[in-house]
């Protein structure tokens, strides 16, 4: 979802 954001770049 928020790919690129720290600390958890989650790919949903």
From Swiss-Prot:
GO cellular component terms attached to this protein's record: extracellular region
Keyword Secreted assigned: yes
Keyword annotations: Amidation, Neuropeptide, Secreted
Locations listed in the record: Secreted
Modification Glycine amide occurs at: 12
Main location: secreted
Function of the molecule: Mediates visceral muscle contractile activity (myotropic activity).
Family classification: Belongs to the periviscerokinin family.
Protein name: CAPA-Periviscerokinin-1
Originating species: Karoophasma botterkloofense (Gladiator)
